[in-house]
Amino acid sequence: PCVKIATAFEPLKRGKNPSIKPDELPEFFDKLINSNTDLLTKYLIQWQLLTMVRPNEAVTAEWTDIDEDKELWVIPAHKMKQTKANENISHIVPLSKQALSLLKKIKSLSSHKSYLFYSSRSRDGYLNSQTANKAIRDNMGYKDRQTAHGMRKIASTYLHEKGVIPDVIEMCL
């Protein structure tokens, strides 16, 4: 009865959020820097890589959520994925030196607005959550190889390879 068991299961397909390998990041950054992508969008992509957040969490980041003195970004529960939002748990993101340095650059462009990644063309006041995907796909040539959400996978893969405890990685994500 188990002879044809393999046909009962679909082979695993590459997910809808593909990602490059961590060792491909230098080339990715080189393409990002040299692309014709808008500067704020470049910063958005870097911010997502440095903070390991979902695209929507990144674009809806507000200056009031950032505590530069404590070097933290507190994402309110209502902006989180449904599971955390239902538990009313804010997500606390410690900001690395690199993230804080990037924050200064972002501030030079958007400190006078509510959102880090503001958009004057959006009725919501911030960039569309697909903005990074469009840049990665169209301006950088990573169609079907990398998505904005897939950047979380790069971080997770890297941390797993470095031997970080899986529960700690999950808490970061």
Task: Please name every model-derived segment.
Residues 2-10, 30, 51, 60-105:
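Conserved tyrosine-mediated DNA breakage-rejoining catalytic core shared by Y-recombinases
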Residues 19-26, 70, 96-144, 150, ...:
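Active-site/catalytic core of tyrosine-dependent DNA strand-transfer enzymes
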Residues 15-17, 33-36, 78-92, 118-124, ...:
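Short, contiguous acidic/charged loop-to-helix segments that flank catalytic cores in large enzymes
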Residues 1-61, 69, 109, 151-152:
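Basic, Lys/Arg- and aromatic-enriched nucleic-acid-binding interface segment
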Residues 1-3, 117, 156:
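Bulky hydrophobic/aromatic "packing anchor" residues in well-ordered structure
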Residues 30-33, 49, 63, 107-111, ...:
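Hydrophobic alpha-helix feature that most strongly marks membrane-spanning transmembrane helices
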Residues 46, 50-57, 131, 135, ...:
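C-terminal catalytic core of tyrosine-transesterase DNA break-rejoin enzymes
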Residues 65-72, 143-145, 164-173:
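Short, polar N-cap/turn motifs at the start of nucleic acid-interacting alpha helices
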